[in-house]
């Protein structure tokens, strides 16, 4: 059964997570030939300049960008970049909104008052970006690959390969472009210390199952995901079917019992009635799992556990893990 599910994951995840975005790059999308190396390849990017020193040339996913001075007017093109700059104490002058109706993550809302939108991640308003006179644009090859020539003509532009599981490498790249590499390293050191503290608070080694309900999809998340990286950093094991170097395994309501684990954490990307969560969670197969019978299945916030994509979101996930699993 495990081998079968893993094979299914490789094919099911072949649909581009660039979605219907014609400006994206499918090679680095889920199932693309460059997906699984995005973290190691991103780690090779950045600048050789001394910390905080400008001018500097930053190597990134689409080439090299020279920054003559420390940026002060930054525009971010996705929620990952938004979390990154805010985690460094920098408020962007403009931001692209997610395609989802939910908009920007609510956990960042108090820091975004007055920050204008520049379109959505897949439908940028280049005129609005130009009008804000940025001196740095942060985005990704996955989302805006084909717009890079136009964006880089507006302002120096630095692209990561893709959001998601390379979130720590992306954060260091953003810190490099902003001349905040020392602070970025400290933020990640503090994050790992927090993860170690969470691990110390948990008795034993419970296997953690991750279930996400989406419109037309039901996913069990693997290691190459934002939340998968966090669980690995904490040192918590995964059920065999999810302990894979893939974004996720796709199952069906009829095979939901493959989600069994010592603890099950689940969320819905959208309204539970629309994603199938309400029906599945009320059904007999869900109720038949031991974790559910014994009260060890817990609903969590989708926007932090699956959409956070940066250090601030990751810190909130750690808080959740400690609250739900700690002594």
What are the roles of these predicted feature ranges?
Residues 260-327:
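Structured C-terminal subdomain patch of bacterial secreted/periplasmic proteins
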């Amino acid at each position: 059964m495990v081998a079968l599910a893993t094979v299914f994951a490789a094919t099911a995840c072949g649909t581009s997570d660039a979605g219907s975005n014609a400006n994206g790059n499918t090679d680095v999308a889920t199932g693309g030939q460059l997906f699984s190396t995005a973290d190691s390849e991103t780690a090779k990017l950045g600048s050789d300049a001394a910390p905080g020193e400008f001018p500097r040339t930053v190597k990134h996913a689409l080439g090299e960008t020279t920054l003559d001075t420390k940026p002060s007017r930054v525009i971010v093109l996705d929620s990952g970049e938004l979390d990154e700059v805010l985690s460094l104490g920098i408020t962007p002058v403009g931001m692209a909104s997610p395609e989802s109706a939910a908009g920007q993550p609510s956990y960042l809302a108090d820091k975004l008052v007055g920050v204008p939108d520049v379109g959505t991640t897949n439908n940028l308003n280049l005129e609005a970006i130009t009008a804000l006179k940025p001196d740095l644009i942060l985005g990704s090859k996955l989302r805006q690959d084909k717009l890079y020539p136009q964006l880089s003509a507006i302002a120096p532009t630095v692209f990561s390969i893709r959001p998601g599981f390379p979130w720590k490498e992306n954060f260091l790249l953003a810190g490099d472009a902003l001349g905040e590499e020392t602070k970025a390293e400290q933020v990640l050191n503090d994050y790992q210390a927090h993860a170690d503290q969470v691990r110390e608070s948990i008795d034993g080694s419970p296997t953690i199952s991750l279930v996400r309900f989406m419109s037309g999809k039901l996913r069990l998340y693997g290691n190459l995901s934002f939340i998968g990286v966090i669980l690995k950093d904490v040192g918590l094991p995964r059920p065999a079917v999810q302990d894979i170097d893939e974004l996720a395994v796709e199952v069906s309501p009829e095979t939901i019992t493959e989600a069994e684990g010592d603890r099950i954490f689940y969320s819905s990307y959208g309204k539970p009635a629309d994603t199938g969560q309400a029906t599945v969670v009320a059904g007999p197969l869900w109720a038949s799992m031991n974790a559910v019978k014994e009260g060890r299945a817990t609903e969590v916030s989708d926007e932090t556990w699956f959409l956070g994509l940066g250090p601030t979101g990751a810190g909130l996930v750690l808080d959740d893990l400690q609250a739900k699993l700690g002594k």
